[in-house]
Swiss-Prot record:
Gene3D superfamilies reported in the protein's UniProt record: 1.20.1280.50
Name the record gives this protein: Putative F-box protein At1g50880
Domain F-box span(s) in chain numbering: 19-69
Coiled coil: none
Pfam families in the record: F-box, FBA_3
Source organism of the structure: Arabidopsis thaliana
Length: 279
């Protein structure tokens, strides 16, 4: 008992000494130290002390000391033979049009459990999506809210007193030319976007819009795992760049993972945002 008490007091003194040494460091010095760490290390450092957690969660610290830490990546999923493969590709607007890369690929065996992509990031969630078709003309107009490229707005049907919520998904509706009126500097500007094409073929024939980069580029990924590449289309400049993914879906890939024919394997994508901002 006496030895346990001595050991307990020794541990308490050690913790007290470490806490006092950390508290003696000025806040500005601590902020500069944390700012030199990568985002993952800063998130882990929040568990060190309340002071470090308070500094690393402060919006001023995140916006000023970590202006370039928030980054987006494109997650690509495909599931042949009950195996889930996930590819994470960081969005880099400075890449040339044709690049051969070997992206990181994670294999999740058949399991009903939820898998984490990163220890500190969000889980893979399956969000149910419902679609309803409404007949008749809508009347009136109202303010809308855009969430992840989907515009939600309130409307009502003829001879009905019930309000409904409509949605307009740009990623699925962008099959024809679109005219947008944008308010900039207290002036309405008309912007006309024509349907994009690649090698004289509409991009929609290759795939739908899978997301938008931070620079406003539309992301196109093929529906099936064939000639695996990603197209980034800039609607302002009407130009595109292509990123080829090598080492995915070829003969070596299939042999290495014990897979057969990859024809017809559908691809699913979503954007992932890494940021220090707390939810």
């Amino acid at each position: 008992m006496e030895q346990q008490e001595k050991k307990k007091r020794k541990i308490q003194r050690s913790i007290s000494t470490q806490s006092s040494s950390m508290s003696s460091i000025p806040l500005d010095v601590t902020s500069k130290i944390l700012a030199k760490l990568p985002a993952k290390s800063v998130l882990r450092a929040r568990c060190v002390s309340k002071q470090w957690s308070s500094i690393s969660t402060d919006p001023y610290f995140i916006s000023n000391m970590f202006p370039k830490q928030s980054s987006s990546s494109l997650l690509i999923f495909f599931k042949p033979k009950r195996k889930l493969f996930v590819i994470s590709i960081h969005q880099n607007p400075n890449e040339p049009q044709h690049v051969g890369i070997c992206p990181r690929l994670d294999l999740f065996p058949n399991s009903k459990k939820t898998h984490y992509l990163e220890p500190y990031l969000e889980k893979i969630l399956n969000l149910a999506q419902t679609q309803k078709q409404l007949e008749g003309n809508t009347i009136g107009d109202n303010d809308g809210q855009c969430i992840n490229g989907v515009l939600y707005y309130r409307a009502s049907l003829d001879q009905s007193n019930v309000d409904i919520i409509m949605s307009f998904d740009v990623s699925t509706m962008y099959n024809k030319d679109i005219t947008l009126w944008v308010l900039e500097d207290a002036k309405w500007l008309c912007k006309h976007f024509t349907r994009a094409s690649y090698n004289d073929q509409p991009l929609q024939a290759l795939s739908g819009i899978n997301g938008i980069t931070d620079d406003g580029e539309f992301i196109y990924v093929a529906y099936v795992l064939d000639s695996f590449y990603i197209l980034y289309y800039d609607p302002e400049k009407k130009s595109y760049r292509r990123v080829d993914l090598q080492g995915v879906g070829d003969a070596d890939f299939m042999l290495r993972n014990g897979l057969g024919n990859m024809d017809g394997i559908r691809i699913h994508t979503c954007l992932n945002i890494e940021s220090l901002l707390s939810l």
